[in-house]
Design a protein with these regions (language model features):
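Alpha-helical membrane segments and immediately flanking helix-loop junctions
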Residues: 33-97, 186-232
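Small-residue-rich segments of transmembrane alpha-helices in multi-pass membrane proteins
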Residues: 1-3, 81-85, 137-139, 188-196, ...
Length: 263
């Protein structure tokens, strides 16, 4: 899986406190916007350049080290689901629709959607940065070994979730006769990539395809959300809150873009 080396690298870098560099720089600005501690802001910045469920991996690392609260973790999960830039611009924009601008606009909408969620969930109380710093007592070989094991376990979780949702979609395709339009939306709610591809195959206007793709990318799909919930299964994350917030803001973003296209 392409995410496997990323999981290993992020775990190694986290062990050596690379996120502290981010929190002391641009992270300070993000922390003011969302009223979160600057360590939490580093998760938002890192997820901009990686892909989900990377946010769950970062959040789990911080929860394991008591660097953030469960409430902050639940809130962060709501607004740190960023699709891969390469996937949105390269696969969706260029490969499926023949336009990098198509993909670029999609990614910018996802970014704005997450920022709005973060502002909506903005903490009412002041956040105080903790001074917790991970002690780096292990040698590099132990760190790499532990990171590889974490990477393998997490990759199996992701792969298993993908297989389950792919099987569900295939069963629906085989035994249920659904309108292609509805099938595209339903597939996207279940599994992001399948939904995006099915929507691109629908005989409809480019504007309608764009709107449906916006909804799917902003919602992230149940497959990706459940990957995150599984990674964080040892913690009592507010799953209901995350699902409701993601769904509502996905609808709001899609409807807003629809109104803009009418102008």
């Amino acid at each position: 899986m392409s995410i496997f080396p990323f999981i290993i690298l992020s775990d190694i870098l986290y062990y050596y406190n690379y996120h502290l560099f981010l929190k002391d720089n641009i992270g300070a600005l993000i922390s003011k916007i969302f009223n979160i501690n600057s360590k939490s802001s580093s998760i938002f910045l890192l997820c901009l350049f990686t892909s989900h469920p990377g946010n769950a991996i970062y959040i789990k690392n911080m929860l394991d080290n008591d660097e953030i609260s469960l409430n902050d973790a639940s809130n962060l999960l709501c607004y740190t689901y960023f699709p891969s830039i390469a996937f949105v611009i390269g696969t969706i924009g260029i490969s499926l629709y023949g336009s990098y601008r198509f993909g670029l606009y999609l990614y910018l909408i996802c970014l704005i959607n997450n920022i709005l969620i973060g502002i909506f969930l903005r903490n009412k109380n002041d956040n105080i940065d903790s001074d917790i710093v991970i002690n780096n007592n292990s040698n590099i070989f132990d760190v790499i070994s532990n990171s590889i094991m974490k990477g393998i376990n997490t990759s199996f979780i992701i792969l298993g979730t993908l297989i389950i949702f792919t099987i569900i979609i295939n069963l629906i395709l085989r035994y249920v006769n659904i309108n292609p339009y509805i099938l595209g939306i339903f597939s996207g709610i279940l599994e992001l990539t399948s939904g995006v591809i099915k929507i691109s195959d629908i005989s409809n206007s480019i504007n309608n395809k764009f709107l449906l793709t916006v909804f799917i990318l902003c919602f992230s799909s149940l497959s990706i959300l459940f990957q995150s919930f599984t990674i964080l299964s040892k913690y009592k994350i507010n799953i209901k809150k995350i699902l409701i917030v993601k769904l509502i803001f996905s609808i709001i973003s899609t409807f807003t873009i629809y109104l803009i296209t009418l102008i």
